[in-house]
C-alpha cells in the first residue's frame, strides 16, 4: 500500500545549531493511526512541520502522494480576545464553507449548535472539537493532530481520543498524532513512534511499551502504559527495533 507521506533520512537544524531531528525515516499509510511520543524538546512538533512542508530540511526528503488532502489541528491557536469571532466565522477560515457543511462538521465532532458562540467563550474541550471540525471540512485523507488535548482534564482527554477513533472509523482517514498522553494514546494507536531527536523505537503500542528505549525515556510512566495497555488491533507493524529505519527509497516491505 502506497504511503500517504514518506520521509527518508530527514534532518532539521535551527540556525546552524545541533540538529533537532537527525536521520529520521518515517511513513504513514492510508487508514492507520500513528502516534509520535517523546519528551519535551524531542522534535515531535518539528517532525510534523517537516512532514507537512512547513520547515526547511537540512538533509533528506519528504514525499507526499499527489493532491494529498490534510486536515491539521495545530498545537497552539492564538485568538485575539479583543476581536469578536463566532464559531461559524472561524470555520470559514481560511476558506469559506456553507452553513450546512459547517453544521454537519460540528455535529460530527459532538458540538452541534455552536455556530453563534464566540470562540473565546468556549471551554477547552469545545474549542478542541471546533478545531477538529474545521480540520474535517476538507474531507482529509490524513488528519494531523499536534498535542490536541493540551489543557483538557483526564475525562476530556479520554473523550477526545474516543472521538478521534470514531472519526477515523467513519472517514477512513489516516491519523498522525503528537502527544504526551501516554496512557490514553497507547490504546488509541495502531503504531507508535518514540522520538528523541531520532527514532528510538517504533511498532505496536504493546511492543513499544516494553521496549528498553521507551522505558528509559519515560520511566515509571512507561511501566504504567505497559500495565494498562489492552489493544487488540491486528496490524502489520508488530516490530520494534532500536533506531529502526525505513530506508532512503521510502519502501518498507512487509
From Swiss-Prot:
Main location: membrane
Entry's Gene Ontology molecular function annotations: ABC-type zinc transporter activity; ATP binding; ATP hydrolysis activity
UniProtKB keywords: ATP-binding, Cell inner membrane, Cell membrane, Ion transport, Membrane, Nucleotide-binding, Translocase, Transport, Zinc, Zinc transport
GO cellular component annotations of the record: plasma membrane
Annotated transmembrane regions: none
Catalytic reactions of this protein: Zn(2+)(out) + ATP(in) + H2O(in) = Zn(2+)(in) + ADP(in) + phosphate(in) + H(+)(in)
Extent of Basic and acidic residues compositional bias: 234-245
Lipid bilayer topology: Peripheral membrane protein
Listed GO biological process terms: response to zinc ion
Superkingdom: Bacteria
Family annotation (SUPFAM superfamilies): P-loop containing nucleoside triphosphate hydrolases
InterPro entries in UniProt: AAA+_ATPase, ABC_transporter-like_ATP-bd, ABC_transporter-like_CS, Metal_Ion_Import_ABC, P-loop_NTPase
Residue ranges of every copy of the ABC transporter domain listed in the record: 5-221
Subcellular localization: Cell inner membrane
Subunit comment: The complex is composed of two ATP-binding proteins (ZnuC), two transmembrane proteins (ZnuB) and a solute-binding protein (ZnuA).
PANTHER family found in the cross-reference section: METAL TRANSPORT SYSTEM ATP-BINDING PROTEIN TM_0124-RELATED, ZINC IMPORT ATP-BINDING PROTEIN ZNUC
Function: Part of the ABC transporter complex ZnuABC involved in zinc import. Responsible for energy coupling to the transport system.
Family, per entry: Belongs to the ABC transporter superfamily. Zinc importer (TC 3.A.1.15.5) family.
Name assigned to this protein: Zinc import ATP-binding protein ZnuC
Organism of origin: Paracoccus denitrificans (strain Pd 1222)
